[in-house]
């Protein structure tokens, strides 16, 4: 699945795609000749590789295959270049260790960071703007990490808000939201924030982000997703009165100590993360808002 995605990335951005170097091992003779103008100690020159040598890609197999597939669809890409780091092959064991080292020590950017820096993706950029325009989020969102440290003044994570917003409009990220859907997302979070008492206390400066994270579930990414799921159903069933329905959020006990969240968002006093728990939490929110569970959602409930 990664190869088609990388291939499409190349084809959709032929002028400004970005790749890191490939890494390969060569099991034959290699000879480096410095450029004449740089003398014998020059670091720039030509690398000669015996064509009978075997080349093993230690890092970049998916990129290499995606480039091959992209060239089939757009031969004009044939003039493009990619840098390659070559190592002398010291045997299978060494190549395997190199593969392990390269992949084990690679640092994968967080989902929040991908959203923050993805200027091509319209939804990502919309979410970045959203957290600066909705009062409860403004200045209280961790933009780079998917978790929040104990001392942080942030209450929410960027990826949590993004995921919950997608659930609200029933979308996967592959389809872009319309302008009307973007307006709905913004309006929804504004209405939700007005109906969660602790969020209002945070806006008023009468409590802190750390206190909310410590004592309540509603800043947690999983709970945000549940609020998004519930919102999608509430709006679908009450297109003209959903704002009134959301006033019932005031009646919910959002504290971690509440039995409502046990085995849904909380297990033995600790927040837990799994898809079933998010759906089960959404069921609580729906029922507290006076919405009957559908047959499918009741089946989820019955498994608890």
Predicted regions and their residues:
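Accessory terminal alpha-helical modules
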Residues: 1-304
């Amino acid at each position: 699945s990664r190869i088609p995605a990388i291939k499409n990335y190349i084809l959709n951005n032929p002028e400004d795609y970005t790749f890191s170097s490939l890494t390969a091992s060569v099991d034959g003779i290699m000879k480096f000749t410095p450029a004449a103008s740089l003398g014998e100690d020059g670091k720039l020159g030509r690398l000669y590789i015996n064509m009978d040598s075997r080349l093993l890609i230690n890092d970049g197999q998916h990129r290499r295959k995606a480039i091959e597939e992209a060239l089939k669809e757009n031969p004009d890409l044939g003039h493009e270049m990619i840098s390659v780091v070559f190592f002398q092959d010291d045997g299978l064991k060494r190549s395997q260790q190199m593969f392990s080292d390269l992949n084990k020590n690679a640092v994968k950017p967080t989902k929040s960071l991908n959203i923050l820096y993805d200027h091509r993706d319209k939804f990502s950029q919309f979410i970045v703007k959203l957290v600066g325009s909705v009062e409860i989020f403004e200045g209280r969102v961790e933009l780079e990490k998917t978790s929040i440290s104990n001392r942080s003044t942030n209450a929410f994570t960027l990826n949590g808000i993004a995921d919950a917003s997608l659930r609200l409009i029933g979308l996967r990220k592959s389809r872009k939201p319309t302008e009307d859907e973007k307006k709905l997302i913004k309006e929804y979070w504004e209405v939700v924030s007005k109906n969660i008492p602790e969020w209002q206390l945070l806006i008023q400066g009468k409590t802190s982000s750390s206190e909310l994270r410590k004592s309540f579930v509603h800043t947690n990414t999983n709970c945000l997703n549940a609020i998004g799921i519930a919102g999608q159903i509430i709006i679908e069933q009450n297109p003209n009165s959903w704002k009134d329905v959301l006033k019932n959020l005031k009646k919910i006990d959002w504290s971690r100590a509440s039995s409502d969240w046990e085995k849904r968002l909380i297990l033995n006093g600790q927040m837990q993360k799994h898809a079933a728990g998010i759906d089960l939490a959404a069921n609580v929110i729906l029922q507290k808002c006076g919405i009957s569970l559908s047959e499918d959602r009741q089946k989820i409930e019955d498994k608890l």
